Regions:
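Short, surface-exposed ligand- or partner-binding patches at beta-edge/loop junctions that are enriched
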Residues: 65
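Rhodanese-like catalytic fold shared by cysteine-dependent sulfurtransferases
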Residues: 1-23, 29-61, 70-115
Length: 115
């Protein structure tokens, strides 16, 4: 599946409250995650997805997010070609933050930010 043809949803269509059966998968790198992420997100860096497929839910909605939407589109294409039903989040965490949706940081005392 081509990353340009993956199913997508905008941040405004998805947030601020995810559906009850939904998982928001953040595929950014560890430093990006630590600086700021959606509070309900699950973190698996893009480079680790193929080795961690067992960590992903087998049912429910899977929404994939990165910084701007490029990596998550590639991850969505990969997941869909391997049996999941994943949806890319257009605009990524940049759009999430710009819309004023909640962010948390893993760094003690640091204000959350998208890097």
């Amino acid at each position: 599946m081509n990353p340009q043809s993956v199913p997508s949803v905008s941040v405004s269509e998805l947030a601020p409250e995810l559906p009850a059966d939904a998982v928001l998968l953040d595929v950014r790198e560890d430093d990006e995650w630590a600086a700021g992420h959606a509070p309900q997100a699950v973190h698996i860096p893009m480079g680790e997805i193929s080795g961690r497929l067992a960590d992903l839910p087998s049912d429910g909605s899977l929404y994939v997010i990165c910084r701007a939407g490029g990596r998550s589109a590639r991850a969505t294409a990969y997941l869909n070609s391997n049996g999941w039903t994943a949806v890319n989040v257009d605009g990524g965490m940049q759009s999430w933050a710009a819309a004023g949706y909640p962010l948390v940081a893993e760094l003690t005392g640091a204000a959350p930010e998208i890097i």
